[in-house]
């Protein structure tokens, strides 16, 4: 079975780097390109059409909605399945994105594991043109509270962990898991590290080394 080809588009380079690392770690996914503005998205789509496009709503030059309009005009075949990302849950924008072909609309911050699940779902379900009709703005996904995500980011920055190193992503996941289940602190090497390793398709020892 061939891997799901994913194109990432977001103007936050740090976020894109984390997203690329996580998706690339999935056994059935491959990141074929990244774009930091709307024009780059259109150019990359002209060169190669991905199975799934992860598209941020707010970007320079062309915003996410303008990119969706461009995609419609390009008449790509096959059409990529599109997951929209945004930090704002405005209903009118959500409706417009769905009308223009978005299959899912996800609010930041979100759990990357859930995003991976959504990618698999839209690939294995009906074509996007049919699937979009069942998507409603009210179903916008908010996985984690913004305050929690902001607090975790602040903590990691205070510790001095650079965002580009591999341990950064593992550390974020560890803090989130412990926040949701403090008892994990009593079984860090036996449960916490192995659970993180499963999510990133690596080993517990690798997770431990990267965090340390």
From Swiss-Prot:
<keyword id="KW-0963">Cytoplasm</keyword>
<dbReference type="InterPro" id="IPR036388">
    <property type="entry name" value="WH-like_DNA-bd_sf"/>
</dbReference>
<keyword id="KW-0804">Transcription</keyword>
<dbReference type="GO" id="GO:0003700">
    <property type="term" value="F:DNA-binding transcription factor activity"/>
</dbReference>
<keyword id="KW-0479">Metal-binding</keyword>
<dbReference type="InterPro" id="IPR016032">
    <property type="entry name" value="Sig_transdc_resp-reg_C-effctor"/>
</dbReference>
<protein>
    <recommendedName>
        <fullName>Stage 0 sporulation protein A</fullName>
    </recommendedName>
</protein>
<keyword id="KW-0597">Phosphoprotein</keyword>
<keyword id="KW-0010">Activator</keyword>
<feature type="modified residue" description="4-aspartylphosphate">
    <location>
        <position position="56"/>
    </location>
</feature>
<comment type="function">
    <text>May play the central regulatory role in sporulation. It may be an element of the effector pathway responsible for the activation of sporulation genes in response to nutritional stress. Spo0A may act in concert with Spo0H (a sigma factor) to control the expression of some genes that are critical to the sporulation process. Repressor of abrB, activator of the spoIIa operon. Binds the DNA sequence 5'-TGNCGAA-3' (0A box).</text>
</comment>
<keyword id="KW-0749">Sporulation</keyword>
<dbReference type="Pfam" id="PF00072">
    <property type="entry name" value="Response_reg"/>
</dbReference>
<feature type="binding site">
    <location>
        <position position="11"/>
    </location>
    <ligand>
        <name>Ca(2+)</name>
    </ligand>
</feature>
<dbReference type="GO" id="GO:0051606">
    <property type="term" value="P:detection of stimulus"/>
</dbReference>
<dbReference type="GO" id="GO:0000160">
    <property type="term" value="P:phosphorelay signal transduction system"/>
</dbReference>
<dbReference type="GO" id="GO:0005737">
    <property type="term" value="C:cytoplasm"/>
</dbReference>
<dbReference type="InterPro" id="IPR001789">
    <property type="entry name" value="Sig_transdc_resp-reg_receiver"/>
</dbReference>
<dbReference type="GO" id="GO:0042173">
    <property type="term" value="P:regulation of sporulation resulting in formation of a cellular spore"/>
</dbReference>
<keyword id="KW-0678">Repressor</keyword>
<dbReference type="InterPro" id="IPR052048">
    <property type="entry name" value="ST_Response_Regulator"/>
</dbReference>
<dbReference type="InterPro" id="IPR011006">
    <property type="entry name" value="CheY-like_superfamily"/>
</dbReference>
<dbReference type="Pfam" id="PF08769">
    <property type="entry name" value="Spo0A_C"/>
</dbReference>
<dbReference type="GO" id="GO:0003677">
    <property type="term" value="F:DNA binding"/>
</dbReference>
<dbReference type="GO" id="GO:0030435">
    <property type="term" value="P:sporulation resulting in formation of a cellular spore"/>
</dbReference>
<feature type="binding site">
    <location>
        <position position="10"/>
    </location>
    <ligand>
        <name>Ca(2+)</name>
    </ligand>
</feature>
<dbReference type="InterPro" id="IPR014879">
    <property type="entry name" value="Spo0A_C"/>
</dbReference>
<keyword id="KW-0902">Two-component regulatory system</keyword>
<dbReference type="GO" id="GO:0005509">
    <property type="term" value="F:calcium ion binding"/>
</dbReference>
<feature type="domain" description="Response regulatory">
    <location>
        <begin position="5"/>
        <end position="123"/>
    </location>
</feature>
<keyword id="KW-0238">DNA-binding</keyword>
<feature type="binding site">
    <location>
        <position position="56"/>
    </location>
    <ligand>
        <name>Ca(2+)</name>
    </ligand>
</feature>
<dbReference type="InterPro" id="IPR012052">
    <property type="entry name" value="Spore_0_A"/>
</dbReference>
<keyword id="KW-0805">Transcription regulation</keyword>
<feature type="DNA-binding region" description="H-T-H motif">
    <location>
        <begin position="194"/>
        <end position="212"/>
    </location>
</feature>
<keyword id="KW-0106">Calcium</keyword>
